[in-house]
Swiss-Prot record:
Keywords: Isomerase, Periplasm, Rotamase, Signal. It is found in: Periplasm. PANTHER family: PEPTIDYL-PROLYL CIS-TRANS ISOMERASE CYP38, CHLOROPLASTIC. Residues 1-24 form the signal peptide. This is Peptidyl-prolyl cis-trans isomerase A. One of its GO terms (molecular function) is peptidyl-prolyl cis-trans isomerase activity. CDD domains: cyclophilin_EcCYP_like.
């Protein structure tokens, strides 16, 4: 009886170590995007956006974002990346995740959010960095909204620089940089 009770207590402690609260207690993860335009450091909010943060970190740890591009850039709005290579070939993402846009985080300048289609729960690998306050993307403004899951803590000048590069259309894609802006690597910082 004592052995089974001790085993149950140990299991509860082990499972609690994986909870969002336990992750937050360790400190929110920081991710470094090394790009052809400079470095951008992100701080992710695992307490308010645990699904989006886990999804993003899983892509980072798998190397998925390495050698992808910021394939859509719009001055005064945002820079979007995480899905295409330099030839505008889309990488195969993991299944979509739940939209966490109702988490209270807002699409303000310097935040990072999940990109998606018209289907509210369609976000996979693509993300965008807001280079302006974009309240119309927040939960309930016009639809469910776009889930913010972190913010830029270093390198906002790099994001601003990327947002100003010349763009053109490539096939069906608009606002594509004429010279690719490449995410050379993405890594979780210790």
């Amino acid at each position: 009886m004592l052995k089974s009770t001790l085993a149950a207590v140990a299991a509860v402690f082990a499972l609690s170590a994986l909870s969002p609260a336990a992750l937050a207690a360790k400190g929110d993860p920081h991710v470094l995007l090394t790009t052809s335009a400079g470095n951008i450091e992100l701080e992710l909010n695992s307490q308010k956006a645990p699904v989006s943060v886990k999804n993003f970190v899983d892509y980072v740890n798998s190397g998925f974002y390495n050698n992808t591009t910021f394939h859509r850039v719009i001055p005064g709005f945002m820079i979007q990346g995480g899905g295409f290579n330099e030839q505008m070939q889309q990488k195969k993402p993991n299944p979509p995740i739940k939209n966490e846009a109702d988490n209270g985080l807002r699409n303000t300048r310097g935040t990072i959010a999940m990109a998606r289609t018209a289907d509210k729960d369609s976000a996979t690998s693509q993300f965008f960095i807001n280079v302006a306050d974009n309240a119309f993307l927040d939960h309930g403004q016009r639809d469910f909204g776009y889930a913010v899951f972190g913010k830029v803590v270093k390198g906002m000048d790099v994001a601003d620089k990327i947002s100003q590069v010349p763009t053109h259309d490539v096939g069906p894609y608009q606002n594509v940089p004429t010279k690719p802006v490449v995410i050379l690597s993405a890594k979780v910082l210790p």
